[in-house]
Every structure is written in C-alpha cells, then in structure tokens.
Amino acid sequence: MMGSHIDTVKNAGALDGCYGVLAGLAVARAFRQAGIRPQRSITIGAFTNEEGIRYQPDMMGSLVYARGLSVDAALNTVGIDGTRLGDELARIGYAG
C-alpha cells in the first residue's frame, strides 16, 4: 500500500499529505510504462479526515481501512456542526 491523506483543514500546507498520494500514482504509472507487473497488487490510498476537525475521531479514513472503526460507525458520526458524515458525503457526491 502507498498513499497518504488529503487535508481537510483550511490553512494546511499546500501539498501536505498529497505528496504521498501522488507518489503512489507515480509509482503505479512508472511500473505500467516500464511493463513491470508486480508480484502483488498495488493499493493506493487517499485518506480523508486525518485531522478530525469536524468529525471525530481523527485519522478516520485510515482507521476504517484498518478495520479499527466500522464503515457504519464512521458514516453515522455526528460532526461538531450537527451534521452526519454519511449525509455530508452524499451531499457532495462522495457517497459510495
């Protein structure tokens, strides 16, 4: 697995976290262009909610991936503004 997080805070570093995601994509592309077929599957992760500003706990995306939190529990999390994460993901077209 390769990847990182994509920031969810307003004044984060310009490319903080995105470098890891882009590096994973670059490796996969380089392998493909060179005709290299890895012995194992490559997974590229682009996790969200690393900081946990609006929805707790922090690092929620990677926590769900590692099975430390169920998808249902994450989607039913209520944020500091009273919104439910699953509803907000649907609202912005990120559900599913």
PLM-predicted stretches and their roles:
Residues 49, 57-89:
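A glycine-rich helix N-cap at a beta->alpha junction
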Residues 30-36, 70-74, 87-95:
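Generic secondary-structure signature for well-ordered alpha-helical cores
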Residues 10-11, 50-56, 96:
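Short, well-ordered, mixed-charge alpha-helical segments that flank or form enzyme active sites
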Residues 13, 18-19, 23, 63-64, ...:
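Solvent-exposed, flexible loop/coil residues
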